[in-house]
Amino acid sequence: FYGGGQERNIRSGTLNVPGIVGFGKAVEISQKEMGAENKRFAEWSGMMFEEFKKIGGVLNGHPKNRLTHNLNVYFPGIEGKSIINSVSKEIAISAGSACTTQNVEPSHVLLALGMDEDTTHYAIRIGLGRLNTLEELNFLIKTISNTINSLKTLSSNI
């Protein structure tokens, strides 16, 4: 497509005015709700980590200077992929960022945070979203905790 002269030959077509107005309204709504959402995510991430600490979970990254809707933890001696495979029918978590899920290399972010290469393979990343409920969060905590305990039992029996 080639733009018209009035668009300096860059963009063809008329501007999507309803889309522009809708986007503006979406930004307005998100700005109003952002503070409450951020607070909720911080509380929920804290809840998850407190429970995971009880079963040996270690936080990857800074405890406060972080995105509140992402929690990255590891459980020493338990491969992240083993955890993911064990819970994949019930919950969606990953071993790295969304853009590197198919990459088998250690996470460059975790390496930059000072983790050694071996430990990066134990990491799991849990992302929260606006539509998640407290019931789902409790289910996630219980499922991952039970999985960790089962994997620890299996590895001690080998």
Which residues does each PLM region occupy?
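Conserved core segment of the aminotransferase class I/II
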Residues: F1-N38
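Thr-Gly-centered strand-to-loop micro-motif
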Residues: I10, G61-H62, I93-G96, G127
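A general structural signal for well-ordered alpha-helical segments in protein cores
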Residues: V17-I20, V27, S45, T68, ...
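Structural signature of PLP-dependent enzymes
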Residues: V27-F49, G56-L67
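Hydrophobic C-terminal alpha-helix "anchor/cap" residues
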Residues: F52-K53, V87
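A short beta-alpha structural unit
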Residues: N60-P76, G129
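Conserved C-terminal alpha-helix-loop-beta "cap" of PLP-dependent enzymes
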Residues: L71-I124
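PLP-dependent enzyme catalytic core of the Aspartate aminotransferase-like
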Residues: P106-I158
